[in-house]
From Swiss-Prot:
UniProt cross-references to Pfam families, sorted A to Z: MinE (PF03776)
Protein's organism: Beijerinckia indica subsp. indica (strain ATCC 9039 / DSM 1715 / NCIMB 8712)
InterPro entries: MinE, MinE_sf
Family: Belongs to the MinE family.
Gene Ontology biological-process annotations: cell division; regulation of division septum assembly
Designated name of the protein: Cell division topological specificity factor
Protein keywords: Cell cycle, Cell division
Primary role: Prevents the cell division inhibition by proteins MinC and MinD at internal division sites while permitting inhibition at polar sites. This ensures cell division at the proper site by restricting the formation of a division septum at the midpoint of the long axis of the cell.
């Protein structure tokens, strides 16, 4: 980069291309959000089902996207009888 290039205004094509790439990335993130949540919910249900018998309706998955941080919130209602059985399995395994 020479000294003369430093004071030159950037051409509009690269700026427009960069803005378009940002816009497309944002659109893809918004469109794919519902699919991602459904996939995560099914995988979380599969993992929980390995250890506890429960109803799939008792699992809520929610994703919130902010400007800088995305948050995944998972709420699971585990029956008290299931936690007692899981504790016995851990004791028996030891």
């Amino acid at each position: 980069m020479s000294l003369f290039d430093f004071f030159r205004r950037p051409t509009s094509a690269p700026v427009a291309r960069e803005r378009l790439q940002i816009l497309l990335a944002h659109e893809r993130a918004v469109i794919g959000r519902s699919d991602l949540i459904a996939i995560l919910r099914e995988e979380i249900l599969a993992v929980i089902a390995k250890h506890v018998t429960m109803e799939p309706e008792k699992v809520n998955v929610k994703m919130e996207r902010g400007d800088t941080v995305s948050t995944l919130e998972v709420e699971v209602e585990v029956p008290t009888s299931a936690t007692a059985r899981a504790g016995k399995k851990v004791v028996e395994a030891a």
